[in-house]
Amino acid sequence: MPYDKGQTQFNMIQKHCFECGTALVEKELEGEGVVPYCPKCEQYRFPMYNVAVSMIVINEQTGEILLIKQYGRPWFVLVAGYVNRGEQVEHAVGREIKEETGMTVSRIKFNRTSFFEPSNTLMCNFTAFVKDDSELSTNKEIDSYQWFMPDDARRNIRPNSLAERFLNAYMDEKK
């Protein structure tokens, strides 16, 4: 899909070439529109962004959904975390759940992606199934957690958040 002027201005957050440091300019690229360009390297510089995973963690025995509270905030959200350089997103799902909750994922299902502009991050949402919560032990990133039946999870997740949109889309597809 071609870039529009507004999108180019957003992409021009990256003002300098990541290889040589030269100031980027806007340049037309056939089939793409206006794209950031390094005149020294003579290369187009497509936008760089973070990649993260967000998980709807489901207990296979009870059907409950795990929601967490983090960083002193008062609302429940989904377990999430950044994908490491060179890491597959599917691996990041299991790693983040293991790091934050101690639980081992038995299987995952990809749901959808959404770009989260405030942190310049492509969020990849998955459903992650755990056999039970006997391994559950949170790390320092999690203040508290709670298992919810699906409808209760929907009522308790942070309103107007990307986590809520992911959970609602998952729940709506389950109907």
Segments predicted by a language model, with ranges:
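Conserved hydrophobic/aromatic beta-strand scaffold that supports enzyme active sites
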Residues: 16, 56, 67, 125-127, ...
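A broadly conserved sequence feature marking short terminus-proximal activation segments
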Residues: 1-14, 166-174
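Short, intrinsically disordered, charge-biased short linear motifs at domain edges
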Residues: 1-8, 17-29
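Residues immediately within or flanking Cys/His clusters that coordinate Zn2+
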Residues: 14-16, 35
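Unchanged
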Residues: 83-107, 112-169, 174
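Conserved N-terminal beta-strand and adjoining loop/helix that marks the start
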Residues: 22, 33-35, 39-65, 82
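Short glycine/serine/proline-enriched coil/turn segments at secondary-structure junctions
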Residues: 47, 75, 117-120
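Conserved Nudix-box catalytic region and its N-terminal flanking loop in Nudix hydrolases
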Residues: 6-7, 56-99
